[in-house]
Structures are given as structure tokens and as C-alpha cells.
């Protein structure tokens, strides 16, 4: 039984779910905003905020953890350079989720997640 399982399944096996969240996190940090389903946006928020917190820490170990998660090496270096000045006074809450119109076809709840 799956009592108190805190991971949103998102209808995928674990390896596919992790790859999808890594790709969405990379895209969100690169572009600044991503349109996706509401459930994916909520799962993406946790991963993105974890990466920004690592970037604010700025240590070598944090940089290596981020390099192991985010697909683009130059993006990690840019994130670590700009995170402390952009989010230095903020303790969490680096993203914003805005609900939009349902998706045509399957009526899934859609949302825009963006960096604050």
C-alpha cells in the first residue's frame, strides 16, 4: 500500500517522471516561464525552487548537485552567477503559478509557471 506517498505520480514511471521534471526545470530556468498542466507545474515548482536555493548557496558541492540535475552546463553557471543578486532577499517562493484556460482536446487544467 502507498500510505502517505508524497511524490506526485503524473501518470508516468519514476524514470520518465524524473526526466520530464529535469527537462521542464531546465526550460523554466532558461525561458523564465513554461505553460504546462497544473499538476506538472506544482511538481516543477519544488524542483525549481530547490535548484535556485542551491544556486543561492553557491558552494562547489551545490554547483555539482545542480550540474547533475540541470541538462545545460552554461545555464547552471548563469544561474549561479545571477541567483544571489536576483533572489538574495527572498527566502523561498521563487516561482508563481497562474491558472489558465483548460487545454482543448482533453480539458486538462493548464497553468503558467514563471520565475518571480
UniProtKB/Swiss-Prot annotation:
Protein family (similarity comment): Belongs to the bacterial ribosomal protein bL17 family.
InterPro entries tied to this protein: Ribosomal_bL17, Ribosomal_bL17_sf
GO annotation terms (biological process): translation
Protein name, entry field: Large ribosomal subunit protein bL17
Taxonomic placement: Bacteria, Bacillati, Cyanobacteriota, Cyanophyceae, Synechococcales
Keywords: Ribonucleoprotein, Ribosomal protein
Pfam families documented for this protein: Ribosomal_L17
A GO-annotated cellular component: cytosolic large ribosomal subunit
MF terms in GO: structural constituent of ribosome
Organism: Synechococcus sp. (strain RCC307)
Assembly: Part of the 50S ribosomal subunit. Contacts protein L32.
Amino acid at each position: 500500500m502507498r500510505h502517505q506517498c508524497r511524490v506526485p505520480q503524473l501518470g508516468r514511471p519514476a524514470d520518465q517522471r524524473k526526466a520530464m521534471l529535469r527537462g521542464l526545470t531546465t526550460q523554466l530556468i532558461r525561458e523564465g516561464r513554461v505553460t504546462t498542466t497544473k499538476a506538472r507545474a506544482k511538481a516543477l515548482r519544488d524542483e525549481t525552487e530547490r535548484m535556485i536555493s542551491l544556486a543561492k548557496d553557491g558552494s562547489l558541492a551545490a554547483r555539482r548537485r545542480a550540474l547533475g540535475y540541470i541538462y545545460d552546463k552554461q545555464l547552471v553557471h548563469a544561474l549561479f552567477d545571477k541567483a544571489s543578486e536576483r533572489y538574495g532577499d527572498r527566502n523561498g517562493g521563487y516561482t508563481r503559478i497562474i491558472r489558465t484556460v483548460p487545454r482543448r482536446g482533453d480539458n486538462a487544467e493548464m497553468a503558467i509557471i514563471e520565475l518571480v
